[in-house]
Amino acid sequence: MKETPGRNFRNHQKKYFKAYLAFLVFCICFIARLLSGQPGNAENQYPDTGKTREISVKASAIPEYSGEPYIILEGNTPDFTDNDLTEKSFENYSELDSLGRCGEAFSCVGQELMPDEERGSIGHIKPSGWHTVKYDTVEGKYLYNRCHLIGYQLTAENSNKQNLITGTRYMNQNMIPFENETADYIKETGNHVLYRVTPVFEGENLLAKGVRMEAYSVEDDGEGVCFHVFVYNVQPGISLDYATGKSRLD
């Protein structure tokens, strides 16, 4: 039977209406995806441990050393985001830059990452700015230590070049209380702590001005461990050339 003009028009209307509905559903889904910012459930997203994010820490924003070994940053509140929060252990270390300098070291520390053996030798590692030099005024004589960004007691990383910087004896000693606080909490509770240490270099200096240390206990929302500090890479009584790592008595 031959279709009448009216019937033909109604058929076209139905086709256009179905196409319009399909397009409308597509637009709604697309907009919802953009607004969510994630292709899936955000609660199930974990940090991408295969790539280190760029964390901006400018040396110029850090006050000059004034006699205290460290300062508190941002009200002692770390800069972790909601997407960083996870109870799944991981560790991630930045590639050395063109000057051989370390970058951010980031981990969610749990008991499963902690060492079960004594630390080995790291004397063969020569971080950027390294010099073997002694002063009678320095405890233990040696001015510089090979400082772990994330302490060995936390992630069992010993001779990892991406986790070792040239640090004064003074800085190394003043990082340890923060490491101990974190390690003791994890051993006592079995919980996890987000832990990030970022060396801060000025320009193309080979010696870091210091390190930014952040930690946050995950399961109890920071009740157990929560700090955000900058520890200075200085040695009282010794002048340091941060461009090269050379030093002299004041």
Predicted region positions:
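Domain-level detector of nuclease and nuclease-like folds
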Residues: 80, 84-250
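Hydrophobic membrane-insertion alpha-helices, especially the h-region
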Residues: 19-34
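N-terminal Lys/Arg-rich, disordered targeting/topogenic segments
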Residues: 1-17
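N-terminal, intrinsically disordered, polar/charged segments of Gram-positive cell-envelope systems
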Residues: 37-89
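Intrinsically disordered, low-complexity segments enriched in glycine/proline and serine/threonine
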Residues: 5-6, 21, 41
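Intrinsic structural disorder/low-complexity segments
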Residues: 15-16, 41, 151
